[in-house]
């Protein structure tokens, strides 16, 4: 779909004239994207033509800047996905809807009305214009606009439970691996795992889900009996399951058993990432390894239990691929380590361009850069800072449960690996700056351009920061957070 702002009066351009609006913020955003993403990134090229695009996979800074520029009228035309339906407040004077679908799914009447409700601005326009583009033999607009369809609100959990009720009941106490071996219905596996978790840590919520479902009384009885029996044999403390409700309790229990039987020392990293210590050989005993190999050992053993690589690469059916680019567990380890070292998106994009294109003699153009960029942003925002973070957080919960309070304090750095990965840095100073509401790329740039003095607190460093050292975009985000000084520090 596309949305646009209109001039107060229609006018025809003279030959050689342009209606492009010059705004230094557009140049600043283009410079940032060329540095952080790639000079051939399509958003750079389109911004220079007065058009932007907007979708959930955009870099956070780029998405926020595009929204600001559109709202302020510096960008008049915006091509976007269904992010408009997901809380992004971008009203427009004119909207063009080119398809009644979100991806492969038909846009519901409710969502369509929500979408077209973005046309018009409460402060400046009493109405907006909506254009629905339809092809011959594919008429849809009139039906959408005139439909009296009502929407019944139902949680996705209930909808899936009613759809896969028999499978969920059968799988409620069965390991995923056994279901796969039996060629069972993988679409019911995640829901069965979630219901196991809710039964163990929030029985009231579990009962509410079940009572509102279409399960028969016999199915409910069978599920309850199996879950009660399961509860009796699990060793993992309930508070660990409670903290990790979207990970299968059966597998959490398996991890807990391994840590308990093998000893915490076999599961606890004790080398620091920015210190040369330990052996680089990955085949030595765990306690002799350097940091990177200890980290790799932990993640690969977590993968053996939880199937992280499969979760990243395959859809819920266990067969369809999420992306044409496959992410091995070793790539996940290496990329997450590089991300915590402070590498930016451009580093990962350039690495893929080299490996997938230039080394194979394939020409580099904007379409290929866009495809790689979309993969890298999804890889970082989903695979690294969501999926892997989820399992590293669980790992920390499990190993710390065997420690004394003093041992937890001594190992605090390693137990916070999930937070470091989510925020994207091993560097305590970067993390401290980010804690003041500064985005990652700006925080890294600040410390690169001006070191923090030993006698300074983080707050003093930010307040006294010399704004002249920064590019306009980074300067803007520092000032927006209430920091920075025009005088040299």
Language model regions located:
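Short, ordered loop/turn segments at secondary-structure junctions
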Residues: 83, 100-101
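Conserved segment of the helicase C-terminal RecA-like domain
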Residues: 90, 94, 101-151
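C-terminal accessory/interaction regions of large nucleic acid-associated machines
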Residues: 175-202, 212, 231-489
């Amino acid at each position: 779909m596309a949305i646009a702002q209109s001039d107060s009066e229609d006018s025809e351009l003279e030959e050689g004239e342009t209606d492009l609006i010059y705004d230094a913020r557009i140049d600043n955003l283009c410079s940032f994207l060329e540095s952080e993403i790639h000079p051939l990134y399509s958003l750079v090229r389109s911004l220079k033509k007065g058009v932007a695009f907007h979708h959930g996979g955009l870099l956070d800074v780029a998405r926020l800047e595009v929204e600001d520029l559109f709202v302020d009228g510096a960008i008049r035309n915006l091509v976007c996905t269904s992010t408009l339906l997901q809380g992004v407040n971008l009203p427009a004077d004119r909207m063009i809807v080119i398809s009644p679908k979100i991806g492969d799914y038909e846009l519901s009447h409710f969502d369509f009305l929500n979408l077209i409700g973005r046309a018009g601005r409460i402060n400046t326009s009493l109405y907006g214009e909506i254009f629905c583009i339809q092809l011959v033999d594919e008429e849809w607009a009139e039906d959408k606009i005139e439909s009296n369809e009502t929407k019944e609100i139902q949680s996705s959990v209930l909808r899936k439970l009613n759809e896969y009720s028999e499978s969920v009941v059968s799988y409620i106490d069965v390991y995923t691996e056994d279901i796969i071996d039996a060629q069972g219905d993988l679409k019911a596996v995640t829901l069965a795992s979630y219901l196991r978790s809710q039964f163990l840590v929030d029985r009231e919520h579990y009962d509410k889900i079940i009572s509102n479902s279409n399960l028969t009384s016999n199915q409910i009885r069978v599920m309850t009996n199996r879950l009660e029996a399961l509860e009796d044999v699990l060793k993992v403390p309930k508070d660990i399951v409670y903290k990790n409700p979207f990970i299968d309790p059966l597998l959490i229990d398996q991890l807990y058993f391994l840590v308990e039987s093998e000893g915490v020392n076999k599961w606890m990293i004790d080398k620091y990432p920015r210190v040369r210590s330990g052996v680089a050989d990955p085949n030595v005993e765990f306690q002799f390894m350097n940091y990177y190999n200890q980290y790799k050992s932990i993640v690969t053993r977590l993968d053996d239990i939880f199937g992280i690589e499969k979760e990243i690469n395959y859809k819920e059916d266990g067969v369809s691929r999420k992306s044409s680019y496959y992410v091995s567990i070793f790539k996940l380890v290496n990329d997450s380590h590089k991300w915590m070292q402070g590498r930016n998106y451009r580093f990962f994009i350039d690495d893929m361009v080299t490996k997938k294109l230039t080394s194979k003699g394939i020409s580099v153009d904007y379409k290929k850069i866009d495809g790689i960029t979309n993969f890298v942003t999804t890889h970082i925002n989903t695979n690294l800072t969501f999926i892997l973070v989820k399992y590293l957080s669980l790992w920390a919960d499990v190993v710390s449960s065997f420690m004394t309070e003093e041992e937890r304090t001594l190992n605090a750095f390693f137990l916070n690996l999930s937070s470091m990965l989510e925020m994207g840095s091993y560097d305590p100073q970067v993390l401290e700056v980010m804690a003041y509401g500064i985005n990652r790329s700006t925080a890294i740039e600040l410390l690169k351009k001006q070191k923090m003095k030993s006698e300074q607190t983080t707050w003093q460093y930010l307040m006294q920061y010399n704004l002249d050292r920064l590019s306009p975009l980074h300067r803007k985000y520092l000032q927006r957070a209430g920091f920075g000084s025009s005088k040299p520090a």
